[in-house]
Every structure is written in C-alpha cells, then in structure tokens.
C-alpha cells in the first residue's frame, strides 16, 4: 500500500501542497474536452502519457496529496484509509486503457511516478515504460543491471539489498553473476535511474503531445518532463482534479476522475478497454494493431469558446519505438 511506502521513506519536510480543493468540470464541458483530447491524439505522431498516484486510487491505493491522501491526512494528524495491498490491487480502467492505447499505436511512451507496479502487472510493455521512482515488485543487479519482476513486493526500500543474488550467467559455461540484488524504490534524496530518466526525457522532447494523468506535477524532475514537449512546440494536456504546478502551460485542462475521462476517450477513439486477466509481464511491445478508420462522430456540445486548441494535421505519422530492456521475470524464491 502507498501507506507502507510513504512510511518507509526518510523524514522530509517539503512534501508539496497537500489537500488542495478538487475541481469538477460540468458533464457537457467534460465531454467536449475529452473529445478535444481524442482529436489531439488522433492527429499527433508521438504521444507520451505521464501518470501519478491519482490513477491508482480506483485500485484501492490512496494517493498522497488528494483530500484523503497519505500526506494530507498526515498533516491533519489522521490515519489514511486503504482498501488493499500492493499484491491484491487490480489495475484500474485507466491502466487497462493505456495498455490498449499502446497496443493500437496511439501511445508512444509511458512515464510513471508510481511505485505500485500496476503498469507492469497490467501488461504494459516494459520497453515503452519509464518508472522513475521504482517498482515495489522489481529488484535489480547492480553488477549486470538485470532486473527481476517478482510476484510479491521485494520487501525493502531505498535501493537496499534484498538478500537474493543474481542468477544470470556471465558467459556460456561460467558461473552466475551472483551480484547482490537491490530494490528499485527511491528515497527522497536518491537520484532517478539513469536509463529510465534518459528514455523519459527523450520521449518527452520528441513527442508532439504529452498527457498527464492524476499527478500534481510537484515532484522534480519528474513533474517537469511534460514541459519538454511544450518547449519543442508540442501540446500539453493535464487531467487532474486538483490544480497542478503547470496549469498555465497546458493547452487543455480536464477536471474529472481519470477513469471517467479515459472511458470517454476510448469511446471517442472507437476502442474497447480490455479486461484484466491477472498479472501479466510483457518485456517488449508487440507490433501495433490497425487503428479504427476514423474518430467517432463529434458530440453536439458547444461551450461558447471555453476550449481553445490548435491541431496539427499528421494523422499518418510514424509511431516512436524504444529499445527493449533486459529483464528476467520469475517468482521470488521462498
């Protein structure tokens, strides 16, 4: 649970602004804004999504700065509520929608600040995913950089030794690497993983559309990555119930529950959200499936100029691809 994760971090005074009031767009305005997002995605050649804790609240994992977030409740001297464990949490509709968007070629890369492992367990391809703050289910060998995805949380935090050794053979016929495996969870002062940060930065700089979901964008440098898209002339869409650090930079701000926004988005794109059939780890993305032939018909909603978005006419541009990451997937030894 994020409660245990937060409790495992070192003491840190500046946790950002917590408990800000939530904003809800009226239903017609929300529908129109999601339609605008669908058009932007359809006409963009490279789309990057940036996700935060807000996409996992529907999975029973509390966020940090929301009205009932871990740190918000901590400031009030109250205990946060939680409904599940990391192992029992199920991917939300948003997690599964992102899987389908990648599968259909609408999503080029995914950058996440979440440590709950739900993107990986949902089946999102790891070669198109940067987990900037780590993953509770992943441990890594510091010698050969091989990562192991476990079926339970690894049990430590702060890049500490987990007590297991790397089993990858150095070369054929020689003994195993036997490097001391460590968790991948960052503490406050730890540097972001070089590879994930490099891929996230490259994807953000080359994208013509960045979409943030369920994040207040307060943590640096993760929260500033979407601005790299803006600096290169791309568009920025922010989906969050609370105000974010970069609202003024956004071309479109959508205030609604992320699951509702993603369900509406998938409907406009003519896509179904797949069901989750249990934990599934996909190391490398599959070739994209054919897209629907066109967007669904535009809804007859007019907002008297409340939404202003410009579009680029590049519906058939190529999709950005990323190199695979060396990953070993297995259950943790008992």
Swiss-Prot record:
Main location: nucleus
GO process terms (BP): base-excision repair; cardiac muscle cell differentiation; cellular response to angiotensin; cellular response to endothelin; cellular response to hydrogen peroxide; circadian regulation of gene expression; determination of adult lifespan; DNA repair-dependent chromatin remodeling
Catalytic activity: N(6)-acetyl-L-lysyl-[protein] + NAD(+) + H2O = 2''-O-acetyl-ADP-D-ribose + nicotinamide + L-lysyl-[protein]; N(6)-tetradecanoyl-L-lysyl-[protein] + NAD(+) + H2O = 2''-O-tetradecanoyl-ADP-D-ribose + nicotinamide + L-lysyl-[protein]; N(6)-hexadecanoyl-L-lysyl-[protein] + NAD(+) + H2O = 2''-O-hexadecanoyl-ADP-D-ribose + nicotinamide + L-lysyl-[protein]; L-lysyl-[protein] + NAD(+) = N(6)-(ADP-D-ribosyl)-L-lysyl-[protein] + nicotinamide + H(+)
SUBUNIT field: Homodimer; binds to nucleosomes and DNA ends as a homodimer. Interacts with RELA; interferes with RELA binding to target DNA. Interacts with SMARCA5; promoting recruitment of SMARCA5/SNF2H to double-strand breaks (DSBs) sites. Interacts with the mTORC2 complex; preventing the ability of SIRT6 to deacetylate FOXO1. Interacts with the CLOCK-BMAL1 complex; recruited by the CLOCK-BMAL1 complex to regulate expression of clock-controlled genes. Interacts with CSNK2A2; preventing CSNK2A2 localization to the nucleus.
Protein name in UniProt: NAD-dependent protein deacylase sirtuin-6
Annotated organism of origin: Mus musculus (Mouse)
PTM summary: Acetylated at Lys-33. Deacetylation at Lys-33 by SIRT1 promotes homomultimerization and binding to double-strand breaks (DSBs) sites. Phosphorylation at Ser-10 by MAPK8/JNK1 in response to oxidative stress stimulates the mono-ADP-ribosyltransferase activity on PARP1, leading to PARP1 recruitment to double-strand breaks (DSBs).
Positions where N-acetylserine occurs in the chain: 2
Similarity-based family: Belongs to the sirtuin family. Class IV subfamily.
The protein's Enzyme Commission number: 2.3.1.-, 2.3.1.286, 2.4.2.-
Note: Compared to beaver, mouse SIRT6 displays lower histone deacetylase activity and ability to promote double-strand break (DSB) repair, possibly leading to shorter life span.
Positions carrying Phosphoserine: 10
Induction: By cold. In hepatocytes, expression is increased following incubation in a ketonic medium.
Outcome recorded upon mutating residue 63 to H: Embryonic lethality in knockin mice; mice fail to form embryonic bodies and retain pluripotent gene expression, leading to impaired embryonic stem cell differentiation
Effect of residue 65 to A: Does not affect the mono-ADP-ribosyltransferase activity. Abolished NAD-dependent protein deacetylase and defatty-acylase activities
Signal peptide: none
Active site (UniProt): 133 (proton acceptor)
Null mutant phenotype: Mice display multiple defects, accelerated aging and die a few weeks after birth, because of impaired genomic stability. Mice do not show any visible phenotype at birth and undergo a normal development during the first two weeks, except for reduced growth. By two/three weeks of age, mice in a 129/SvJ background display severe metabolic defects and develop abnormalities usually associated with aging. These include acute loss of subcutaneous fat, lordokyphosis, erosion of the superficial colon epithelium, severe lymphopenia, osteopenia and severely reduced IGF1 serum levels.
Gene Ontology CC annotations of this record: chromatin; chromosome, subtelomeric region; endoplasmic reticulum; nucleoplasm; nucleus; pericentric heterochromatin; site of double-strand break
Residue ranges of domain Deacetylase sirtuin-type in the record: 27-272
Region of interest: Disordered: 312-334
Protein activity control: Compared to the defatty-acylase activity, the protein deacetylase activity is weak in vitro, and requires activation. The histone deacetylase activity is strongly activated upon binding to nucleosomes and chromatin in vivo. Two molecules of SIRT6 associate with the acidic patch of one nucleosome, while the C-terminal disordered region of SIRT6 associates with nucleosomal DNA, leading to efficient histone deacetylation. The protein-lysine deacetylase activity is also activated by long-chain free fatty-acids.
InterPro entries in UniProt: DHS-like_NAD/FAD-binding_dom, NAD-dep_sirtuin_deacylases, Sirtuin, Ssirtuin_cat_dom
Described purpose of this protein according to its UniProt entry: NAD-dependent protein deacetylase, deacylase and mono-ADP-ribosyltransferase that plays an essential role in DNA damage repair, telomere maintenance, metabolic homeostasis, inflammation, tumorigenesis and aging. Displays protein-lysine deacetylase or defatty-acylase (demyristoylase and depalmitoylase) activity, depending on the context. Acts as a key histone deacetylase by catalyzing deacetylation of histone H3 at 'Lys-9', 'Lys-18' and 'Lys-56' (H3K9ac, H3K18ac and H3K56ac, respectively), suppressing target gene expression of several transcription factors, including NF-kappa-B.
CDD domains given in the database record: SIRT7
Enzyme class: transferase
Residue list for modification N6-acetyllysine: 33
């Amino acid at each position: 649970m994020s409660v245990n994760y937060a409790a495992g971090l070192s003491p840190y005074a500046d946790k950002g602004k917590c408990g800000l009031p939530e904003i809800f767009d009226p239903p017609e305005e929300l529908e129109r804004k999601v339609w605008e997002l669908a058009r932007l995605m359809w006409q963009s050649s490279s789309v990057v999504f940036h996700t935060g804790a807000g996409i996992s609240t529907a999975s029973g994992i509390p966020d940090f700065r929301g009205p009932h977030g871990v740190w918000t409740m901590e400031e009030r001297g109250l205990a946060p509520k939680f409904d599940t464990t990391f192992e029992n949490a199920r991917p939300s509709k948003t997690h599964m929608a992102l899987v389908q968007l990648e599968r259909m070629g609408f999503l080029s890369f995914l950058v996440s600040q979440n440590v709950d492992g739900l993107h990986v367990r949902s089946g999102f391809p790891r070669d198109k995913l940067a987990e900037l703050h780590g993953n509770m289910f992943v441990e890594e060998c510091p010698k050969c950089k091989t990562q192991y995805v476990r079926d339970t949380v690894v049990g430590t935090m702060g890049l500490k030794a987990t007590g297991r050794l790397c089993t990858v053979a150095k070369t054929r016929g020689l003994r195993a690497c036997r490097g001391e495996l460590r968790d991948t969870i960052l503490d406050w002062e730890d540097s972001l993983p070089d590879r994930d940060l490099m891929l996230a930065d490259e994807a953000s700089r080359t994208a013509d559309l960045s979409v943030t979901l369920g994040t207040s964008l307060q943590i640096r440098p993760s929260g500033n990555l979407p601005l790299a898209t803006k600096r290169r002339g791309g568009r920025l869409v922010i989906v969050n119930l609370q105000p974010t650090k970069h609202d003024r930079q956004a071309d479109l701000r959508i205030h609604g529950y992320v699951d509702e926004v993603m369900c509406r988005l998938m409907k406009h794109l003519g896509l179904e959200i797949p069901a989750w059939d249990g934990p599934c780890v996909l190391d490398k993305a599959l070739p994209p499936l054919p897209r629907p032939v066109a967007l669904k018909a535009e809804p007859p909603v007019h907002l008297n100029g409340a939404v202003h978005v410009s579009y680029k006419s590049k519906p058939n541009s190529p999709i950005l691809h990323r190199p695979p990451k060396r990953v070993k997937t297995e259950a943790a030894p008992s």
